[in-house]
Amino acid sequence: MRQLAQIGYRTVQLSAVGQIAPQTMREICDENGLTIVLTHTDPERMLVNPEDVIADHDVLGCRLIGIGSMPPRYRTAEGVRRFTADFMVPAKMMRDAGKRLMYHHHNFEWERIDSGQNMLDVLLEDFAQDLIGITLDTYWVQAAGADVCDTITRLAERLDCVHLKDMAVKGFEQRMAVVGEGNLPFGKILKLLQRLGTTRYLLVEQD
């Protein structure tokens, strides 16, 4: 965290911090002038004990509670409907507590399902805008064969956060890359985000 602060970052996302207690993470971030703006939190814990998840985020001073990936059992035409049903209660609890459930996608959400829609369409249809936001990942939108700028425009009111990640190629292989070292049009992407003005946090990610 000290190194991030020295680079000049002022906001961070927490993900996979292991057994470090929320209070300890808050103290570490506070000591380095970093504000926690988003987490990726175990979705199973959200289902079993959403009250504790909300309480932990109160300690962290973090409003946005993120699902890093849809659990595999939901990644079917029937499963995605179960996902929206199962997570509706924690999403409402988070909203009522002044938080927002955030969903981070990959590329499989663009897979066409039986209804002719894709999985992302179902999420947007079933969850009202005040119940779920989308953490858009520039790499994974491109990997899905979708247009990054069109997707940003479509999801603008849900995009509290955007993961900035580039895509490079080696032969026929797609590779994650540092922003600016791949082929995504980040000048165009950033100008669009600035013009729309709905995204609060741009989070640089390097898997």
Identify the function of each model-found stretch.
Residues 1-64:
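N-terminal pre-domain/capping segments
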Residues 1-2, 22-26, 50-54, 84-91, ...:
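Generic structural signal for well-ordered alpha-helices
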Residues 4, 12, 29, 57, ...:
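Conserved, mostly hydrophobic/aromatic
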Residues 7, 34, 60, 130, ...:
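Structured loop/turn residues at beta-strand edges in well-structured enzyme cores
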Residues 12-14, 36-41, 65-67, 101-103, ...:
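Hydrophobic faces of well-ordered beta-strands that scaffold small-molecule active sites
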Residues 43-133, 141-143:
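Active-site acidic/histidine proton-transfer and metal-coordination neighborhood
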Residues 96-186, 192:
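Acidic/histidine-rich catalytic cores of soluble enzymes
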Residues 182-207:
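Long hydrophobic alpha-helical segments typical of transmembrane helices together
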